Design a protein with these regions (language model features):
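Short secondary-structure boundary micro-motifs
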Residues: 17-20, 29-32, 113-115
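Short, conserved acidic/polar surface loops in the N-terminal third of protein domains
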Residues: 57, 69, 85-88
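Extended, solvent-exposed segments with strong compositional bias
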Residues: 94-131
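Selective for proline/serine-rich intrinsically disordered segments
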Residues: 5-8, 22, 89, 93
């Protein structure tokens, strides 16, 4: 489920639309790993969109070994969305000309899902799937209506990465995601030790073969 999404670990976004944190795109599949670190904190991300661009956002609630996750609300804000819902639930007053779709926190989390690549677990949360009617700047707003703190994950976008460089970085992504979840990365050390050991055996075998060839001559 997480494979195909570019993981990003941004800094703390601003809490208003003018101070929002820029994201390269809301179209390419990305995973935003972040944390609400204070009661009442609001995170706002922004990206430029064209008319007709699809904006898909899903909240993922991480299952952490020692707790510390949060189940926040989130919203998509932009000019002239096809529909607007629950705007009054936003943590700030919306400027004129903007519309929003708000996804409140789920009432319950039923069954966690395990990611096949990293073995991390998370609860799939609500999804907003909309599109922009006009070009301009769009925003994703994250906050906790109950002033809770903790880690959260946003999966945004719908376009799969096509560059080979993404797939070449899968081991790095595995390392980063496991570390953010607070899970063991011992498997990476074992794999590295195995590669080093295999390389040493191969090198020794080649040296032995060359030595035997010289002795035969």
């Amino acid at each position: 489920y997480l494979a195909g999404s570019l993981p990003e670990f941004p800094g703390i976004p601003g809490s208003t639309l003018p101070t929002s944190l820029s994201v390269p795109s809301f179209q390419q599949k990305r995973l935003l790993f972040n944390r609400l670190g204070q009661p009442g904190q609001v995170h706002v991300y922004r990206a430029d969109c064209r008319a007709g661009d699809r904006i898909r956002v899903q909240m993922l609630v991480p299952v952490l070994p020692v707790g510390g996750a949060v189940v926040p609300a989130f919203a998509v804000v932009a000019h002239s969305l096809p529909y607007s819902a629950d705007v009054h639930k936003l943590p700030f007053t919306l400027p004129a000309g903007l519309s929003a779709v708000v996804a409140p926190p789920p009432t319950e989390l039923v069954t966690p899902v395990a990611d096949a690549l990293t073995s991390v677990r998370y609860y799939p949360g609500p999804t907003i799937d909309t599109k922009t009617l006009v070009g301009g700047r769009a925003y994703i707003v994250v906050w906790s209506p109950h002033n809770h703190m903790g880690k959260y994950v946003l999966q945004i976008g719908n376009r799969w990465p096509m560059r080979w460089t993404y797939w070449a970085q899968i081991p790095l992504f595995w390392w980063q995601i496991r570390g953010w979840f607070g899970l063991s990365r011992a498997a990476a050390y074992l794999a590295l030790a195995g590669i080093v050991g295999l390389g040493a055996l191969t090198f020794a075998a080649l040296r032995g073969r060359k030595r035997a060839k010289r002795d035969a001559e």
